[in-house]
Every structure is written in C-alpha cells, then in structure tokens.
Amino acid sequence: SVIELGKMIVQLTNKTPASYVSYGCFCGGGDRGKPKDATDRCCFVHSCCYDTLPDCSPKTDQYKYKWENGEIICENSTSCKKRICECDKAVAICLRENLKTYNKKYKIYPNILCRGEPDKC
C-alpha cells in the first residue's frame, strides 16, 4: 500500500514521500505525457509495474517487508502482496539511484503540461 511505499522511500532516499507527490508527470498519479527526468521515469516504470497486477490492489493492499542491512526484503504469503512489494521496492531503489536528477521545478508539476505520446511499458 502507499503506507509501505512511503516508508521505503524514506528509508532509501531520506526524502519524505511528499517530495514525490505530483512530481513530474508520473509520480503520485497523473500518468500522462513523457517523463520529465530520470526521477519521473522511475515513477513511470512503477506505474507500468502496477499495470501488470490487474487482479491486485497495489495502493491499498498492505504487505510486510523487512529492512535488513540497508536492504528491503519482501516477505508475504500471497502472490499479490509479494508482487506489489517488489514493484514498490523497485521504485524506491530507482528513486535512490536517481536522487541527483531530482529537480524542485518538477515538484507539484501541473499535469496539463504533460504532453506527448507516453512511452510504452
């Protein structure tokens, strides 16, 4: 769920989840146009990951994970929860790897400015 995702973001980036709400064209919803930078592309890929889970509820299904030696370990009994956790883990890692591309001008970015054909997942 968004709760676990938020915790992962804090643990891996030391940024608050609010830093990514309405960031660019894909972080925190919107999902249109082209990603603005590598950080926004992380969210695009995350959205694509969620698209592969049509029978799951990634925003509301809570799951369990461990934080061990600076690493996220997904531990769930159900397939849906494990896959949601893996999607969230991947975006948190991606955001950490692309912290240098984070640009404040894309925070609370107007969705109307997100134009162009979206990339394919």
From Swiss-Prot:
What's a single GO CC term here?
extracellular region
Assembly, in brief, is: Monomer.
Task: Spell out the molecular function terms from Gene Ontology.
Answer: calcium ion binding; calcium-dependent phospholipase A2 activity; phospholipid binding; toxin activity
- InterPro entries in the record, alphabetically? PLipase_A2, PLipase_A2_Asp_AS, PLipase_A2_dom, PLipase_A2_dom_sf, PLipase_A2_His_AS
* Keywords from the UniProt entry: Disulfide bond, Myotoxin, Secreted, Toxin
Family per similarity comment: Belongs to the phospholipase A2 family. Group II subfamily. S49 sub-subfamily.
Could you tell me which CDD domains the record lists for this protein? PLA2c
- Additional information: Negative results: does not show antimicrobial activity against E.coli and S.aureus and does not produce appreciable hemolysis on human erythrocytes.
- State its location(s): Secreted
Q: Where is this region: Important for membrane-damaging activities in eukaryotes and bacteria?
A: 104-116
The biological process GO terms on file are:
arachidonate secretion; lipid catabolic process; negative regulation of T cell proliferation; phospholipid metabolic process
Q: Provide the protein name.
A: Phospholipase A2 homolog ECO_00035
